[in-house]
Design a protein with these regions (language model features):
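Short tryptophan-centered beta-strand motifs in secreted/extracellular beta-sheet-rich domains
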Residues: 64-65
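Membrane-interfacial catalytic/cofactor-binding modules of polytopic membrane enzymes
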Residues: 2-59
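Juxtamembrane boundary at the C-terminal end of a transmembrane helix
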Residues: 109-121
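C-terminal ends of transmembrane helices
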Residues: 10-13, 83-89
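Transmembrane helix interruption/hinge and helix-loop junction motifs
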Residues: 68-75, 91-95
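A cytosolic-side transmembrane-helix exit/cap motif
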Residues: 43, 95-104, 118-121
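Membrane-interface transmembrane-helix boundary segments in multi-pass integral membrane proteins
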Residues: 47-56, 90-102
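Central hydrophobic cores of alpha-helical transmembrane segments
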Residues: 77-87, 101-105
Length: 121
């Protein structure tokens, strides 16, 4: 799962639309997963577009750190994932995507605890 997030973040990072902060607006304008009414709402809000786009990108690139993050902070990663995938489910209608990714979080938490025990922190 960490690899899935990281690779997704990497390919977003090399995309000009993600780097310039326009990707969320572009996604909302797609025929398959778009929501033209939502795209229209954020059309003139370039700071919001950039913030959401870059928060998504940074979250995905940093997610592998969940394996090395101590107990209370790991929940911030999981909360970020729930918000990210919840937003995707609501906006794009990808409900099974939400459940598939969130279902892996307990296993990631256990792996995180075991890895931290091995590393001694």
């Amino acid at each position: 799962m960490c690899l899935a997030y990281f690779v997704s973040g990497y390919f977003k990072l090399v995309s000009p639309q993600w780097r310039n902060g326009q990707a969320i607006f572009d996604v909302l304008n797609t025929e398959t997963f778009g929501r033209p009414n939502m795209a229209e709402l954020i059309q003139d809000k370039t700071n919001l577009q950039k913030t959401v786009t870059w928060c998504t990108l940074v979250f995905e690139l940093m997610f592998p750190l969940v394996l090395f993050t101590p107990y209370p902070v790991v929940y911030i990663f999981f909360l970020g994932g729930v918000l990210l995938h919840g937003g995707i489910a609501l906006v794009m209608g990808l409900n099974s995507f939400f459940w598939a990714f969130i279902a892996t979080y307990p296993a990631l938490w256990i792996c995180s605890l075991q890895l931290q025990a091995v590393l001694g922190y």
